[in-house]
């Protein structure tokens, strides 16, 4: 690549190669594998590896957009380190990244051979003194909702269960739980966009309640399907029995009648 880009810090602004993510949100301290296939994304990976640079990972709003413009991407993402790159084919690479810190883009150049972002570190505002009582109640609600989700989804890994049940740090839980439990990427991004810890706790409670309700609905649907299948199988079995009985000839050749006199 002949394009020259200088990664620098200017007035707390970082200039980094960026990768637009489809249906994926990476949080700080999140270690994640994903595949990169678009030319601009591969070019960003190659440049970052060659120059030992971090990258800015940002989700695009429309997953179908092949070449999204700046306005088609969210404001907040994560500055990440590329830990590993594996070439899958000529036009596909698989990378392992580790999220470092949350950042907000101030500019995004989409015209070059790869996306180039100007970003500012965006730490989440901690809980204020007057918010502590609400935060404590919300955190308790998060733990209760997690237990409810766990009871309906036993496939949650033991590592996730241990991390959530053994930790009471709201800042950690507000990033760890969305990264590992929430299904919809829009829900993950909503947490990423929220800049206050109390706001993140409120969002997390709301999203976990919805996740629990969705699991309840899934269970109800599965039960109804099972009941319908059982009924259909019983009806089919009875129908086949009646059909066989109606078709079976009755022989009186060797029938012995009882003596009555």
Listing of model-derived features with the role each one plays in the protein:
Residues 256-261:
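A short, hydrophobic C-terminal helix/tail in secreted or cell-surface proteins
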Residues 1-255:
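N-terminal low-complexity, acidic/polar interaction/targeting segments
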């Amino acid at each position: 690549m002949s394009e020259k880009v200088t990664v620098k810090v200017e007035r707390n602004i970082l200039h980094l190669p960026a990768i637009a993510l489809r249906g994926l949100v990476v949080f700080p301290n999140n270690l994640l594998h994903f595949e990169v296939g678009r030319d601009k994304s591969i070019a960003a990976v190659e440049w970052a590896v060659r120059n030992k640079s971090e990258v800015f990972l940002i989700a695009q709003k429309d997953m179908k957009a092949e070449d999204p413009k700046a306005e088609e991407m969210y404001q907040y993402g994560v500055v990440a380190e590329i830990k590993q790159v594996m070439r899958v084919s000529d036009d596909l690479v698989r990378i392992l990244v580790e999220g470092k810190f949350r950042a907000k883009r101030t500019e995004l150049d989409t015209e070059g051979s790869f996306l180039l972002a100007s970003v500012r570190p965006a730490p989440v505002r901690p809980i204020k003194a007057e918010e502590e009582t609400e935060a404590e109640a919300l955190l308790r609600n998060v733990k209760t909702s997690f237990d409810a989700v766990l009871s309906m989804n036993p496939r949650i890994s033991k590592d996730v269960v241990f991390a959530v049940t053994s930790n009471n740090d709201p800042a950690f839980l507000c990033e760890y739980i969305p990264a590992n439990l929430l299904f919809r990427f829009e829900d993950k991004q909503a947490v990423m966009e929220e800049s206050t810890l109390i706001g993140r706790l409120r969002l997390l409670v709301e999203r976990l309640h919805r996740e629990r309700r969705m699991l309840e609905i899934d269970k109800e649907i599965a039960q109804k399907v099972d009941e319908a299948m059982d009924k259909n199988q019983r009806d089919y079995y009875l129908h086949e029995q009646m059909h066989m009985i109606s078709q079976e000839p009755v022989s009186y050749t060797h029938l012995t009648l009882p003596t009555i006199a």
